[in-house]
Structure formats: structure tokens, C-alpha cells
From Swiss-Prot:
Residues that, per the record, bind Zn(2+): 405, 408, 424, 429
Gene that this polypeptide is encoded by: ligA
Top-level class of the enzyme under EC nomenclature: ligase
Coiled coil stretches, renumbered: none
One GO CC term on file: cytosol
PANTHER family xref list: CHROMOSOME TRANSMISSION FIDELITY FACTOR 18, DNA LIGASE
Keywords (A to Z) from UniProt: DNA damage, DNA repair, DNA replication, Ligase, Magnesium, Manganese, Metal-binding, NAD, Zinc
Name by which UniProt lists this protein: DNA ligase
NCBIfam families: dnlj (TIGR00575), PRK07956.1 (NF005932)
The keyword Magnesium appears for this protein: yes
BRCT domain boundaries: 587-674
Cited InterPro entries: BRCT_dom (IPR001357), BRCT_dom_sf (IPR036420), DisA/LigA_HHH (IPR041663), DNA_ligase (IPR001679), DNA_ligase_AS (IPR018239), DNAligase_adenylation (IPR013839), DNAligase_N (IPR013840), NA-bd_OB-fold (IPR012340)
Cofactor: Mg(2+); Mn(2+)
Species for this entry: Endomicrobium trichonymphae
């Protein structure tokens, strides 16, 4: 790169980093993800390293990110609140570990590892055991005085509970908001001002900087302590000793904290947290690894912006910016017209993303998004990515809902003003029928293994399936002609089709796709009414007598079974030999008869759905909340408030291994807890 180009690139990177730093810390309105920001910073750092003549003392690479708002008084920290060096790969983490071991002459160093909370850094100061000051990190040297707001954070003690508290004690931690509280807050904000926070970090930051402390109190903020600032009259040998002292003082610590003695232990813990991060009740964006010994920390020292004895391993980005290429409109199996976003491909959390959900047309209007706009997308867990906001507006027009179904060109309607969704009401709409077929053969419905979308599309193209019952009249010659089908594959699929005829009524009801009726309600009404004919003869009053069915579900059921087209569908299925009866539940004679169960936390060997089916097959019942009527609570990993309530009510608590033994489903898979 020639000199002029080097200078231009450096100028651009510095301006961009300063701009994005302001958007992140001052406006709480970032345009790019953390990883994208770090990539810009690393590029600038590398150029400055290779071209030292261009390096300046005030470069963003040499300063702690952050700012001090003029809206608050300022507080000087007793010692700098530094940022941490970041790494985005386990390979880089291993290199850092090896560097530490080498610098310490391989002293069999202990390390601590804990989740990195995606919140807002804060410093707390206690004088003689009483909370006297709270401050943001600010620029690392000076922070904003948020003392009155910090006092409103739910789990921060006003007075330290430990005996003989030190005269001066400054500690640091992260202010955050629980996922469930964040969802509730966003619903309230949306209702009152028509906007919502993009993520929980923004919510915590905005709530902590309120001029009215009462608003902060209502936001249900929480605090995790993670590091020592300064303490008089007391010494700690290690980071873990310091944290245990904080626990005695009344602070809440993270449960997912581990002391490691080798790189393998660190990597194993990283894998567990990467795979289980979405089970936590708060957001984390990585893991923090520290040398445990405070004496060794002192030996390793600091750079101008971060400690050498700690590193932050950042998870793959859950947010990224990209361009919205096209808004595609598609038809669901119940006729709902749904928009979805076609994106320029971008890597997010290790996955290439090219689609995102837009939910409905009101969401498009709320986001003010259109084709060509640059958008921020987010992926939480394994759910479909969503568009969080428009970053750069390129298209000034408004995207309008279509007037006609994109599949059959029939008119589309809103059935009532309360509904958000538009529907195609043509019962012969090809797109609806295709979606209906996909649902009908799916695992939780008729469970015809191997009858996937590609098979369905070929049969539709060849006009071999025109009504549901046609599935059961397909011949060997029809299957063997499908792409990539040979003898064994054909035989297996024909067996799966034949086996599906014998499924209980409950699976058929779910497969039929009755509006508002899910799998659980399908099971309930099948057990109650026993046969398809009884359902056709039932009145609305008959349906509402079932405790789990209210007036809206009863109306959906009645409308469905009154429909002449439905009657024809069922008659055709009966003629094809499909079972229309719910078998009597076997009398198990176990202690589950009539017992009420609640499932909580993450189960390793079962899905919630599978565990519920096991319980019901043995005569038990499954409830969604704990009460005095609960007999058992099955507690998986990260069980929350339900487990706490169960303990208060003296409900029998079993873990997954005990549940497997009770049900005779003992698994050979070890139930890993962390």
C-alpha cells in the first residue's frame, strides 16, 4: 500500500471508530455489531504496527472506548476501569493461554472463567460498609455519577453484610436486565411511545441514565460483581477469594463460574457455555478468562488500555448489518399472507444468513423498512433471524401489502379489525395446499418419515396429489420414478405411509391444521371425544365443557367440523383406511396415575414435548405452572423461578436422571450440569 493510501485508510478507520464509539456509548444506537467494530479496530492496529510513523498517541487503538456525558456529574475512579482484549476464536484464546504460561515460566497457573454479561459496566463505592457512590465506566478514568439510580438496582446492597467491612471498598460489575423483564419492558415501551429497545444492553444503559431514579427502579435492573477496584485494610490472594468475599457482603454472583487448571478445562467450559448460552435468563456475549492469582496478575501487568492477565472470548456475532434485497410475500397453510426478507448473505453466529422474518405488514410499517435499505439483523438461539432496525434508508417509499394472493391471485382480506394478518380465503389455493401437505406429513402430525418438501413438490408437479387422501393411493411406480429413489428408499417410504394410517386420532387432528388448535389441544379433545364422528356431532357447548378449551377455541372447532369441504376430506381419508379413533389409554398402574408434573429448565435427553408424552402415557398430567396441586417438578439445567416456588411448596423435585429411572427410560447419556 503506497503512503497516500495508507494515510487515507488510517484517517477513514479512525473517523469510523470514533463515530461508532459515539453511537454505541452516547446514543445507545449502534449501526454495526461488536465484531464488526473490533475488526475495524484490529485493522487500524495492524496498519499502525506496520507503519509506526503514522501512529498517533490519541489513536482510538490506544484509548479506552467510552464517554462521559455532560448530563451527569463526574466521578473519578480510584483506579482505571480498563477494557479487555477480545478474541473471537478458541485458537486465539489458546495462543493467549500459552503466552501467559510462558511469561509466568509455566507455574501451573490457575485461571477463572465466567460468562461475559451483555450489560453496562458500573463501579460501586462503599465507605464503612455503606453505598456512597455509583458510576459508569465513562472514559476509564472518569465516569458519570449515577449513584441515585444505582441505589434502585434490585440486588445491590445498601449496606455490606460482612462483619467489619473495610473503610473504603470500590468494586466493579455489570448492570443488566433479565430476558423476561426485557420482553415485558419492551411491550410497555411500545404501547406507551410506539418504540422499543433494540436489545437488553440498550435497555440497561438507557434505564441507568434516567434523570428520574423512580423510572430506573421500575426497569428491574440487576447487577453481577466481577472485579475489584480498590480496597483498604483487606487483601485477597485471588480473584475467586475476592468474589467469595463479595458473596458474604450480599452481592449476587454468577453460578456459571469455574476455576480451571489447564487449557483443556478452559476449552471444555467454553464448549458448554457456547452450546447452552441461550438457556441463561440473561444475555451474555462471551466469556472472560482471568489469571486467578492477584500476585501473578500484578506480575503480568497492563497495556495502556487493558490488563495482560485477562481476555474476553467473544461469541460469534448475533447481530450484523446487511442489505434488504427483496421483500417476498408467501402463503401459509391457513391462508395467512406473510412477508419475509431476502437479504444479501451475511455470516451471523457462525451461520450464513440470507433470510429474515418480517412477521406481518404492520411490522414492516413499524420498522419503516423497504427493499434496498441497509438493516441490522439479529439471531437469538436457533430462531429465524429478524430485522431489528433500519441502519441506512435507501428507499423512501413505503412497502404496501398486496391486494391479491401471490399464489392463486384471489383477493385477500383481514377477517376483522383486531387481526394483524391478511388471509387468502380461496380453499383451493395451491400454495395453501402445499403448506398443508408439508404440515400433514410432518413428524408431530402423521409422521411420514421421508415424505419431505422435495417429494411433495414432485407429486404436485405430476398431479399425483390433488387432495390429502391421494397420499394413501400412491403406488410403487409413483415412488420409484421420484428423483434419487431406488428400491430401499421406495420401500421405506411406502411402509411409513401405510404405518401412518394407524396413528391415533390425536395425531390426525393436529395434522388437519385446525386453526388455533395445536398438538396439546388435539390430544385433549381426542381423549375427550374418542372418535372423529363424535367431533362432527359436538356442539359449541360440548367443546367448552372441556376445561382447557375456551370460547374462541370452541368456535374454531365448531366452524371446522361444520365445513362441508372438511367432511369430504375426512370421508376420503376414511375410504383410504386412515384411523379415526383415539385408543383408550393403557392403565399403567404406576405412581404417575393422576399425578401432576411441571417441567422446568433445559432437559438434555428429552425435549419438553417428549417428556410430556412420557408422563401422559403413564397416566400423569403436565401443568405449566407450580401450585399446591403439583406432585413433581422435573428440574433440568438452569431451572428458574418454578424450581424456587416448588421448594417453597415442598413439591417433590427430581432431576432428569431420576425422571428417567421413574419412567423406566433410563438414558446412557450423562446428564451434564454446569
Amino acid at each position: 500500500m503506497i503512503m497516500g493510501n495508507i494515510q487515507n485508510r488510517i484517517d477513514y478507520l479512525r473517523k469510523e471508530l470514533i463515530r461508532h464509539n459515539g453511537l454505541y456509548y452516547e446514543s445507545n444506537n449502534p449501526e454495526i455489531s461488536d465484531s464488526e467494530y473490533d475488526n475495524l479496530a484490529k485493522e487500524l492496529e495492524q496498519i499502525e504496527k506496520e507503519n509506526p510513523l503514522f501512529a498517533l498517541p490519541d489513536s482510538p487503538t490506544k484509548k479506552i472506548s467510552g464517554f462521559v456525558s455532560s448530563s451527569f456529574e463526574q466521578i473519578k475512579h480510584s483506579s482505571p476501569m480498563l477494557s479487555l482484549d477480545n478474541t473471537y476464536s478458541q485458537k486465539e484464546t489458546a495462543k493467549w493461554y500459552e503466552r501467559i504460561e510462558k511469561n509466568l515460566n509455566n507455574k501451573n497457573t490457575e485461571f477463572t472463567i465466567e460468562p461475559k454479561i451483555d450489560g453496562v459496566s458500573a463501579s460501586l463505592t462503599y465507605i464503612n460498609g455503606s453505598l456512597t457512590a455509583g458510576a459508569t465506566r465513562g472514559d476509564g478514568e472518569t465516569g458519570e455519577d449515577i449513584t441515585e439510580n444505582i441505589k434502585k438496582v434490585k440486588n445491590i446492597p445498601y449496606k455490606l453484610k460482612a462483619d467489619n467491612p473495610p473503610y473504603f471498598f470500590e468494586l466493579r460489575g455489570e448492570v443488566y436486565i433479565d430476558k423476561s423483564d426485557f420482553r415485558k419492558l419492551n411491550e410497555e415501551i411500545l404501547m406507551s411511545v410506539g418504540q422499543k429497545f433494540a436489545n437488553s444492553r440498550n435497555a440497561a444503559s438507557g434505564s441507568l441514565r434516567q434523570k428520574n431514579p423512580q423510572i430506573t427502579a421500575e426497569r428491574k435492573l440487576r447487577f453481577f460483581v466481577h472485579s475489584l477496584g480498590k480496597i483498604d485494610g483487606k487483601q485477597f490472594e485471588s480473584q475467586s477469594d475476592f468474589l467469595q468475599y463479595c458473596r458474604k457482603c450480599g452481592f449476587q454472583l454468577q453460578d456459571n463460574f469455574k476455576i480451571c487448571h489447564s487449557l483443556k478445562e478452559i476449552m471444555d467450559f467454553m464448549e458448554i457455555m457456547i452450546n447452552n448460552r441461550d438457556l441463561l435468563h440473561y444475555e451474555i456475549d462471551g466469556l472472560v478468562i482471568k489469571v486467578n492469582s492477584l500476585q501473578l496478575q500484578k506480575e503480568l501487568g497492563y497495556t495502556n488500555k487493558s490488563p495482560r492477565w485477562a481476555i474476553a472470548f467473544k461469541f460469534p456475532a448475533k447481530q450484523a448489518t446487511t442489505k434488504l434485497s427483496r421483500i417476498r410475500v408467501q402463503v401459509g397453510r391457513t391462508g395467512i399472507i406473510t412477508p419475509s426478507a431476502i437479504l444479501e448473505s451475511v455470516t451471523l453466529a457462525g451461520v450464513t444468513i440470507s433470510h429474515a422474518t418480517l412477521h406481518n405488514f404492520e411490522e414492516i410499517e413499524r420498522l419503516n423498512v423497504n427493499e434496498g435499505d441497509t438493516v441490522l439483523i439479529e439471531r437469538a438461539g436457533d430462531v429465524i433471524p429478524k430485522i431489528v432496525k433500519v441502519v441506512k434508508k435507501e428507499n423512501r417509499g413505503f412497502f404496501k401489502p398486496p391486494h391479491n394472493c401471490p399464489s392463486c391471485n384471489s383477493g385477500i382480506v383481514k377477517e376483522n379489525e383486531e387481526e394483524v394478518a391478511y388471509r387468502c380465503i380461496n380453499p383451493e389455493c395451491p400454495a395453501q395446499f402445499r403448506r398443508h401437505l408439508i404440515h400433514f406429513v410432518s413428524r408431530n402430525a402423521m409422521d411420514i418419515d421421508g415424505f419431505g418438501k422435495a417429494v411433495i413438490d414432485q407429486f404436485l408437479d405430476r398431479k399425483k396429489i390433488q387432495v390429502l387422501a391421494d397420499i394413501y393411493y400412491l403406488k410403487y411406480d409413483d415412488f420409484i420414478k421420484l428423483d434419487l429413489f431406488k428400491e430401499k428408499k421406495t420401500s421405506n417410504l411406502m411402509k411409513a405411509v401405510a404405518a401412518s394410517k394407524k396413528h391415533p386420532l390425536s395425531k390426525l387432528l393436529f395434522a388437519l391444521g385446525i386453526r388455533r388448535i395445536g398438538e396439546k389441544v388435539s390430544e385433549i379433545i381426542a381423549k375427550k371425544f374418542k372418535s372423529m364422528e363424535a367431533l362432527f356431532n359436538a356442539s359449541i357447548e360440548d367443546f367448552t365443557r372441556v376445561p382447557e378449551i375456551g370460547s374462541i377455541l370452541a368456535l374454531s372447532l365448531k366452524e371446522f367440523f361444520e365445513n362441508k369441504t372438511v367432511r369430504n376430506v375426512i370421508d376420503n381419508l376414511i375410504a383410504a383406511g386412515v384411523n379415526m379413533i383415539e385408543p383408550e389409554a393403557e392403565q399403567s398402574g404406576t405412581q404417575f396415575d393422576g399425578k401432576m408434573f411441571v417441567l422446568t429448565g433445559e432437559l438434555k435427553n428429552h425435549t419438553r414435548e417428549q417428556a410430556g408424552k412420557i408422563i401422559r402415557s403413564l397416566g400423569g398430567k403436565v401443568a405449566s405452572s407450580v401450585s399446591k396441586k403439583t406432585d413433581y417438578i422435573v428440574a433440568g439445567v438452569n431451572a428458574g423461578s418454578k424450581l424456587k416456588k416448588a421448594k417453597e411448596l415442598n413439591v417433590k423435585i427430581v432431576d432428569e436422571a431420576e425422571f428417567d429411572i421413574l419412567t423406566g427410560k433410563l438414558s446412557l447419556i450423562e446428564n451434564t450440569k454446569f
